[in-house]
């Protein structure tokens, strides 16, 4: 057993209001520059829909993730090394700019410079940020399907409608929608790492964040195909691939990611998970796709187990990280309460951004007699959002974990309603789903009224373990822009150090 730590995230889809604040703040911080105008490290999609880029869940088209061969070994869906090499100069499975959208801005200056005597009102016309030319029509955007925008024929192409009678959902009274915020999953078994010909993508040992070395990247773009979530983008200006970096400078300082910090609905939770690195290959190679969710749970370790703590210390895990794992909201939701579920585990990448499935307005529907009752609780299989749709999205089609999560959230609500409204303790619903009163109270606290320090339990990094500090002693101190050699010469052979240096030692003339 080789223990490693990973900073994971849980998003509570039951509280997401689709405001796109996370997307905008992430965009402003990381991709508001030339070359990545079309890139959104974080975006919020409305489901059902084809998403961004278009039809990203269709792996028959894009060949992302892993497949299990007959001999039980894993191989990238896009092929082995020889097949990858054969496509290196012409990759047929790469999404084009039209699968994303042509980024644009508006000629706002025209509103100021238009002549006064014009018979028509001046307008700000769209202009392409790629060609610089005016666009006759905006064909697409990063959230083109927002709030079920578009006809049902296009929404019905959503891959999560597989094994569902989707024709009935084209009728207005049967429509449903939910928001799905997406970012890089920072997988335990990332396919992008395996498909990069340059070896530029790596997974950090201390926190599990997957990064692209910009010095090694050669722009082959195989990683874009290899990533089944299509969360790697090609910077056409620099010729490099870029992706969500999980705001690692903030994570190293013990702070949450930008998207988590600015989330209006407070739906995001960050925490540390300890896992057995030796068990990853065995879990990802599970034969039945529906078993992948449980196999990934088996990879995670109990941070309160004395044997796990002892082995973690031997493997170099700092004590502060172990303590953070013991308080991790991600561990509680994924492992203890089993409310959070992984996004498309059938891709076999073992994703580390998990989701709490959304509840439809089930109680009001039950009170109106539109839903049947299954004991104490309303029948969750009659939800407006089909359970099979959620299962296709979160558990490779297995409805049992989804039903368990929905019933537990519903039981918690039933218990708290009886406590706060009726003034009595009713544990029948909790007993039905296998929860204790203490667990129900804790679930309520985390999902409804959690404080900042409860939602984000992120230990600061230990730089002293990453780099020896002693050789830096008596190194480069303060200089006047002349490097570390201590001279104050005005000349430099390469004219690099002193080009912008300010001569602060010269005397200034007194003012008259």
Residue ranges and their predicted role:
Residues 1-512:
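Non-ligating segments of multi-cofactor redox enzymes
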């Amino acid at each position: 057993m080789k223990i490693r730590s990973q900073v994971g995230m849980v998003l509570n889809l039951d509280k997401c209001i689709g405001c796109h604040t996370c997307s905008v703040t992430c965009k402003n911080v990381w991709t508001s520059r030339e070359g990545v105008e079309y890139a959104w490290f974080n975006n919020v999609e409305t489901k059902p829909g084809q998403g961004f880029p278009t039809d990203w869940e269709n792996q028959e088209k894009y060949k992302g993730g892993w497949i299990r061969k007959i001999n039980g070994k894993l191989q990238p869906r896009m092929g082995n090394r020889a097949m990858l090499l054969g496509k290196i100069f012409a990759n047929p499975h790469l999404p084009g700019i039209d699968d994303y959208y042509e980024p644009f801005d508006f000629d706002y200056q025209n509103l100021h410079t238009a002549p006064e005597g014009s018979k028509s009102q001046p307008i700000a016309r769209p202009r392409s940020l790629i060609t610089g030319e005016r666009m006759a029509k905006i064909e697409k955007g990063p959230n083109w399907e927002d709030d079920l925008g578009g006809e049902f024929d296009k929404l019905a192409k959503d891959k999560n409608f597989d094994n569902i009678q989707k024709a009935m959902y084209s009728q207005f009274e049967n429509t449903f929608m939910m928001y799905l915020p997406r970012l890089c999953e920072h997988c335990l078994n990332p396919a992008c790492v395996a498909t990069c010909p340059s070896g530029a993508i790596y997974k950090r040992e201390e926190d599990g964040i997957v990064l692209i070395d910009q010095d090694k990247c050669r722009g082959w773009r195989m990683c874009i195909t290899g990533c089944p979530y299509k969360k790697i983008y090609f910077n056409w200006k620099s010729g490099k691939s870029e992706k969500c970096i999980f705001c690692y400078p903030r994570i190293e300082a013990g702070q949450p990611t930008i998207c988590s910090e600015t989330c209006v609905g407070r739906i995001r939770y960050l925490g540390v998970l300890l896992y057995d690195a030796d068990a990853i290959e065995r879990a990802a190679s599970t034969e039945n796709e529906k078993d992948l969710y449980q196999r990934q749970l088996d990879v995670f370790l109990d941070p309160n187990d004395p044997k796990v703590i002892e082995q973690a210390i031997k493997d170099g895990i700092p004590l502060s990280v172990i303590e953070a794992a013991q308080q991790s909201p991600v561990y509680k939701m994924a492992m203890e309460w089993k409310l959070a579920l992984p996004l498309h585990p059938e891709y076999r990448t073992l994703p580390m951004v998990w989701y709490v499935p959304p509840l439809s307005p089930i109680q009001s529907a039950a009170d109106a007699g539109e839903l049947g009752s299954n004991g104490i609780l309303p029948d969750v299989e009659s939800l407006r959002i089909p359970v099979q749709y959620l299962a296709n999205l979160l558990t490779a089609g297995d409805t049992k974990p989804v039903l368990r999560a929905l019933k537990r959230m519903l039981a918690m609500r039933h218990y708290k309603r009886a406590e706060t409204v009726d003034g009595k303790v009713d544990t029948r619903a909790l007993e039905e789903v296998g929860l204790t009163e203490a667990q129900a109270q804790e679930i309520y606290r985390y999902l409804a009224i959690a404080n900042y320090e409860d939602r984000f339990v992120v230990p600061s990094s230990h730089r002293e373990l990453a780099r020896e500090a002693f050789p830096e002693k008596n190194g480069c101190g303060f200089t006047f822009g002349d490097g570390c050699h201590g001279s104050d010469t005005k000349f430099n052979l390469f004219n690099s150090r002193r080009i912008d240096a300010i001569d602060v030692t010269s005397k200034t003339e007194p003012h008259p």
